[in-house]
Amino acid sequence: MKITNDNAATINYWLAIVEPFLTSDEDRNSDDIIRKFRAVVAEHGDTEEVDPEVFFAIFSILATKYGRVYSKKVEELNESLKAAILAGAEAEDLRNKLKDISQRYASQLEITADREQQLESLKKKGHEQPLTGSGSSEPVHAESAHAPQLHVVNDLQQFYIPFNEYPSLTQSIGTSDIANDEHLKRVQLTLKITDTKVFSRTGFEFAISCGSRSTSDKDPYDGIIKISGKSHMRKDIAYAIRTSGITVRQFCAAFANLYWNFNLARNTPPENWRKKGFTEGTKFAAFDFFYAVGSNAAIPTEADGSVRLIRPPTNEENEANSAMRYADIYEQNSKTAGHVTSSPLYNRGSSYESKNKAKLLEM
């Protein structure tokens, strides 16, 4: 039987084949996934050509299904916890259940993200070989052996270093767009917080509050942050940051990896994502220091100094956040550049566009 999109409606059949690839945390090597898929297909008795697009389509459907199930459970437990707290009832059991389901949800998101990356990589390769149960394939015809070859001349070849002579990477990683350790230490000193852990928590709480609001100089930074029995005015923290030689956005960018995982684990996007024009599929990217997510120059998520995101941002999230930042710039400049509208649709390509690119991180 040849499996095509026409008979893929037998969802139970495909569920049995594809679901293990969605839920298993083993074997993240993208080079092995199709081989294992072929083996599973063979176990189900199909030895003829398999349309890979069927696998991709069903996988996407199942990933969405799992996400909705976990999201609903988290939402229900959150509501139950709120009701219990309001009623003054014991809520420790609910908290533990919420923590457990949130961790499982985060793990599922991570597995799904890994699988999506693997499958996307495989799709880009073109799948010149058909997916069959036996793993056999037709030979790919190469171009003529007599085709002219391009010879590349590199003027920097004199500086070539063999791989086995590469120096060990010990220098600090940094970028001007993200606050470094010296910047953070200056802010800590200005705030007179001697305990680094307390300062880290204070900084993270501040970044969380900015994620749902803004890191702009125009923001009033009203509100109070309480850590370890001590209160800090948000405007005082913002002042300490600016007087330390960095912007609030650069400071918050240092916490971008933590903030990203924090929101995904709780399934809670920045509060004002709708107001900023983000969609349901891009709402987690609705904060203005999003550009630092995944950067090794930001605070790591792991104790060994590595960065491990629950899932990486999608292309749609990257594009939506980039569009938001450009829209903010156009709106700001249209007030002084003589434009009758701030819409990027009408103003894009104006003479001041390239100049404004440098201002993306200054807003």
UniProtKB/Swiss-Prot annotation:
Q: Which UniProt keywords apply?
A: Capsid protein, Coiled coil, Helical capsid protein, Virion
Q: Where in the cell is it found?
A: Virion
* GO molecular function terms noted in the UniProt entry: structural molecule activity
Which parts form a coiled-coil structure per UniProt? Answer: 72-111
Q: Name one Pfam family in it.
A: Flexi_CP
Q: Which GO terms describe its cellular component?
A: helical viral capsid
Q: Where is this region: Disordered?
A: 122-144
What InterPro entries does the annotation carry?
Answer: Pltvir_coat
UniProt main location, coarse: virion
**Which named protein is this?**
Capsid protein
Q: Which organism is it from?
A: Citrus leaf blotch virus (isolate Nagami kumquat/France/SRA-153/1984)
